[in-house]
Amino acid sequence: MCLLIKKLYLTFARSTSIIITLVIIDQLSKWWFIDNLRWTPGLMLKVTSFLNMVYTWNYGISFGLMREYYQYSNAIFLITNTLIVCYLYYLMIRSNTIGSFAGYSFVIGGAVGNLIDRCFRGAVFDFIHFHYHNYSFPVFNLADCFITIGVIILIEDYDNTKKVIEEKIKGNYDNAQIEAMAEKIRNTDQGGNDKV
């Protein structure tokens, strides 16, 4: 029991420090660009031929979707995002691999960064804008980058874990061991977080 409490404490301490670090980086970047871009002509700073820093507020969800429903949806976004962050934190504490732990930390850090914006500013501040000729990618921020990186890590971790389980099954195991491993794969495929 004491070992379980120690593991939970270490997981909580590590995850919280990673999440807080990511939130601080996100909020400092937003603060700096809000403070400096508002005085830039056209609210835009050209960095390269394909990258601009722009001053824009996102009242919708990712990439500005549903922004026309802002007056009805901000409270719903706040509640939904908070519940999702809590659920992801629960999954992270249950995670058994470094990859899933890191992936959840990045997703939660990014989600909390955007949640802070929505809670205290009423919208999410976006400032990174990639474009090339007539193509223009939606404006985003570092929190969005953290979420994307976290999802990529989680997908890679899932694939690697599944490969390890499949390799173990190919070995010389008795039927009970094979059935136990297959059950873990089924649980993982159904959205569980069990890993071998």
UniProtKB/Swiss-Prot annotation:
Transmembrane portions of the chain: 17-37, 73-93, 96-116, 135-155
GO CC, alphabetical: plasma membrane
Keywords, alphabetical: Aspartyl protease, Cell inner membrane, Cell membrane, Hydrolase, Membrane, Protease, Transmembrane, Transmembrane helix
EC numbers, comma separated: 3.4.23.36
Annotated function: This protein specifically catalyzes the removal of signal peptides from prolipoproteins.
Assigned protein family: Belongs to the peptidase A8 family.
Protein name: Lipoprotein signal peptidase
Organism per entry: Rickettsia akari (strain Hartford)
